[in-house]
A protein has these predicted regions:
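A short beta-strand-turn-helix
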Residues: 62-78, 106
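N-proximal helix/coil linker or "cap" segments that precede and/or mark the start of modular domains
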Residues: 33-60
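A generic local structural motif
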Residues: 65-68, 100-101, 193-194
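Short gly/ser/thr-rich secondary-structure transition/capping motifs
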Residues: 60-66, 187-190
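Conserved strand-loop elements at the edges of beta-sheets that form or border functional pockets
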Residues: 73, 82, 225
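C-terminal cap of thioredoxin/glutaredoxin-like
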Residues: 2-35, 164-249
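Structural alpha/beta surface segment adjacent to cysteine/selenocysteine redox centers
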Residues: 76, 81-167, 238-239, 246-247
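Short clusters of hydrophobic/aromatic residues that line enzyme substrate/ligand-binding pockets
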Residues: 69-71, 157, 223
Length: 249
């Protein structure tokens, strides 16, 4: 009896040790993931502190035939394509300090067409859902006011905020609810991520800035980070003054 009791205790101890080892292994994996994410955040933070310029190849149909969220005149000679994340504090800082001036001095004056695309980062767990909600608002002509609400409440991102914001914007709630579950809308967000990644984008906010000709964005400049209005204005004014010429000509 004593031997069976001893064996049972040993078996239980071995099971508990095995479970503990498994938990430790899982914790190590999670710590490795967190470590990688922290490194990414650090790199993005550094990127956002200094202007980075890179010239890309000409982008065809950069505005999705007008189907993407946009502001400004369709005939504007310059364009900015934004890649943003609704949980990104640097994106919020850009909107608060730079975007409003760009809108007043370039977009509203017909000089620049502004296109918004999504680039939710993997470690921002609510960012992709927020991007879907914004795109669903776009279907009902309320993208920009929804975008403003999402950025102003980035700590409360989630279904409750999306629903209350949609109600405040007087959206068709049935249509909005169906859209939130539409795989095609999520696929559009994923396509933006794939497209941005193909351009070398890895952090937010990031921007393509270039001249427009025949529906193409000619050799755009890739600008990374929450840069000042002065940085954007310098790039735009330089492009406006330069003759139209593609790389290699």
């Amino acid at each position: 009896v004593k031997q069976r009791h001893k064996t049972a205790i040993q078996s239980k101890v071995e099971q508990e040790l095995s479970a503990l080892k498994q938990e430790v292994s899982e914790l190590k994996k999670q710590l490795a993931i967190i470590g990688s994410q922290v490194k990414d955040i650090h790199n993005i933070a550094l990127d956002s502190q200094r202007p980075q310029h890179k010239t890309l190849t000409t982008q065809e149909n950069f505005d999705g035939d007008g189907a993407l969220a946009n502001l400004g005149e369709a005939t504007a000679g310059l364009a900015i394509v934004e890649f943003s994340d609704y949980q990104c504090p640097y994106c919020k800082r850009y909107i608060d300090t730079t975007f409003t001036k760009l809108k007043t001095n370039f977009i509203d004056k017909g000089k620049v067409k502004y296109i918004a695309r999504d680039f939710p980062l993997a470690f921002h767990k609510q960012a992709k859902g927020a991007a879907v909600a914004a795109n669903c608002s776009l279907q009902q002509g309320a993208y920009w006011p929804m975008r403003e609400r999402l950025f102003n409440n980035m700590r409360q991102l989630g279904d409750e905020l999306y629903q209350s914001s949609a109600e405040q914007l007087s959206l068709d709630m049935d249509q909005f609810a169906k859209c939130l579950e539409d795989e095609k809308v999520l696929a559009k967000v994923e396509q933006d991520i794939t497209y941005g990644s193909s351009l070398g984008i890895r952090g937010t906010p990031s921007f393509l800035i270039g001249k427009v000709e025949d529906g193409r964005l000619l050799n755009p400049t890739l600008l990374v980070g929450a840069q000042s209005y002065e940085t954007f204005a310098a790039v735009l004014n330089e492009l406006a003054a330069a003759p139209v010429q593609e790389a290699g000509e």
